[in-house]
Structures are given as structure tokens and as C-alpha cells.
């Protein structure tokens, strides 16, 4: 296993099975963030993640964290909160604001650079990247974004500026996604937060098999049309 240097003139990727074991899943570096290359990466179970000032790094970890939307774990406290939620949840209303919210400075810094923002804005304009917004009246208080692959959604990042805002984004999206035929969410790497919401780990091989199948399937034609997914009870 060795780290592969990508060409700027060829969007092909090496097999994810050749990724390093340490750091887990690092597959290649270089290339660019063009829409064609990003889409090729997602189709092969690969995603970019790198720190400001570093070269573009491409990953395909083993194991892979996934969440079946129908298996979202709703805690008692979250169930009580959501029953009286003050939030309105929308789809594809404010992609730029959501990715900017995810990129806002945090204690640990951010990997969402201006280049990443511009790259995913292009994917959104092309109809591949999507956002879920959580509003308190007309103020954006949370959200998430990711890339669609048929009936699989590759979650990239989320943010929260109010109590349970990001959980609300994920909960409402999972409910709608599952209801309309969505099968799987890619969470990339398991952490305490996603595990508490029902995410589990599967092998990379299993994930790639699921990806190959699910990206060929289709959601209803109008699924990604900007719309309201949830309104607070009056």
C-alpha cells in the first residue's frame, strides 16, 4: 500500500482497497476539486478531507460509518423536544449559508476552506450537493449538507447555533429521506455523536457494495426541490 499522487489532468482514482491502514483510509493526494473529480470520488466511496495549507487529501476509511435513516435513534429527551420544537426545517433553501455555518471557526479549527466551499457550491448548482436548514423564525440556527448518490446520501458536515438544531436537521431529513425511498446515509467515520444517533460501522467492502447498488437507484424526481420539511406547531 502506498499513497498515490493524482494528476491534475486525469480524474481517475486508484482502488479504495489500496488505502493506507494508518492513517486509516488515506488513499491519494493532489488533483483538484473540480465537479467531475468530486463526483468520481463519491461514486467510488472516496471523499476529500484536509487541513488549510495541506495538499488535497482523499480518503476511504475501513470501517465506514453509516446510518440507516429508518434506524435513527430518537432519545426520550429529543422526542419531547421535537414534539414542541420551535424550529422550521427546509431543504435546499440556503446551501451557501449552511456550508458557511459549518465552516465557521471552532475550537478545533475547520477543514472547510474557501476552496471546499466553492467546490461544493458548484456541486449544489449542478444538483448534486444539498442542504437541510433549521430556522428559528427567520434566523438560521443549524443545518447540514452532503452529496446525493441515488438513494444514498453522503453527509459532509453539520452545525448548530441553538439547542438540538443539528439533531433536528438530521432527524427531519432522515424521516423524509426514508419515507421517500432513501436507504442509507454515509457518516464517513464514527464518532460519539453519530453513534448516539444510531450510526454503526461496516467494512469498506460492504459500504462499496452498498454504494454500487444504491447509487443506481432513484429517489422521486422532485425529492430535492427546495421545500419546507417541517413546521412548528402553532
Curated annotation (Swiss-Prot):
Gene Ontology CC entries for this record: cytoplasm
GO BP terms: protein catabolic process
Keyword Cytoplasm: yes
InterPro entries (alphabetical): Acyl_CoA_acyltransferase, Leu/Phe-tRNA_Trfase, Leu/Phe-tRNA_Trfase_C, Leu/Phe-tRNA_Trfase_N
Enzyme Commission (EC) number: 2.3.2.6
Keywords, comma-separated and alphabetical: Acyltransferase, Cytoplasm, Transferase
Compartments it resides in: Cytoplasm
Molecular functions per Gene Ontology: leucyl-tRNA--protein transferase activity
Catalytic activity annotation: N-terminal L-lysyl-[protein] + L-leucyl-tRNA(Leu) = N-terminal L-leucyl-L-lysyl-[protein] + tRNA(Leu) + H(+); N-terminal L-arginyl-[protein] + L-leucyl-tRNA(Leu) = N-terminal L-leucyl-L-arginyl-[protein] + tRNA(Leu) + H(+); L-phenylalanyl-tRNA(Phe) + an N-terminal L-alpha-aminoacyl-[protein] = an N-terminal L-phenylalanyl-L-alpha-aminoacyl-[protein] + tRNA(Phe)
Function recorded in the entry: Functions in the N-end rule pathway of protein degradation where it conjugates Leu, Phe and, less efficiently, Met from aminoacyl-tRNAs to the N-termini of proteins containing an N-terminal arginine or lysine.
Family as reported in the entry's similarity comment: Belongs to the L/F-transferase family.
PANTHER family: LEUCYL/PHENYLALANYL-TRNA--PROTEIN TRANSFERASE, LEUCYL_PHENYLALANYL-TRNA--PROTEIN TRANSFERASE
HAMAP family: Leu_Phe_trans
Protein name as annotated: Leucyl/phenylalanyl-tRNA--protein transferase
Organism: Enterobacter sp. (strain 638)
Amino acid at each position: 500500500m502506498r499513497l498515490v499522487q493524482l494528476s491534475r489532468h486525469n480524474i481517475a482514482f486508484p482502488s479504495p482497497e489500496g488505502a493506507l491502514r494508518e492513517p486509516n483510509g488515506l488513499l491519494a493526494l493532489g488533483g483538484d476539486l473540480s465537479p467531475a473529480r468530486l463526483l468520481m470520488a463519491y461514486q467510488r466511496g472516496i471523499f476529500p478531507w484536509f487541513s488549510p495549507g495541506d495538499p488535497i487529501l482523499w480518503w476511504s476509511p475501513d470501517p465506514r460509518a453509516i446510518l440507516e435513516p429508518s434506524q435513527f435513534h430518537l432519545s426520550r429527551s429529543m422526542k419531547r423536544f421535537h414534539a414542541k420544537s420551535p424550529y422550521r426545517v427546509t431543504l435546499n433553501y440556503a446551501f451557501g449559508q449552511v456550508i458557511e455555518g459549518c465552516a465557521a471557526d471552532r475550537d478545533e479549527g475547520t477543514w472547510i476552506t474557501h476552496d471546499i466551499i466553492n467546490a461544493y457550491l458548484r456541486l449544489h448548482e449542478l444538483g448534486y450537493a444539498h442542504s437541510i436548514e433549521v430556522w428559528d423564525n427567520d434566523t438560521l440556527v443549524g443545518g447540514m449538507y452532503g452529496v446525493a448518490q441515488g438513494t444514498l446520501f453522503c453527509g459532509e458536515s453539520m452545525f448548530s447555533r441553538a439547542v438540538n438544531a443539528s439533531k433536528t436537521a438530521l432527524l427531519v431529513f432522515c424521516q423524509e429521506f426514508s419515507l421517500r425511498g432513501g436507504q442509507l446515509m454515509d457518516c464517513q467515520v464514527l464518532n460519539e455523536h453519530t453513534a448516539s444517533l444510531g450510526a454503526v460501522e461496516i467494512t469498506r467492502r460492504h459500504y462499496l457494495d452498498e454504494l454500487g447498488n444504491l447509487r443506481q437507484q432513484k429517489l422521486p424526481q422532485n425529492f430535492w426541490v427546495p421545500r419546507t420539511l417541517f413546521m412548528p406547531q402553532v
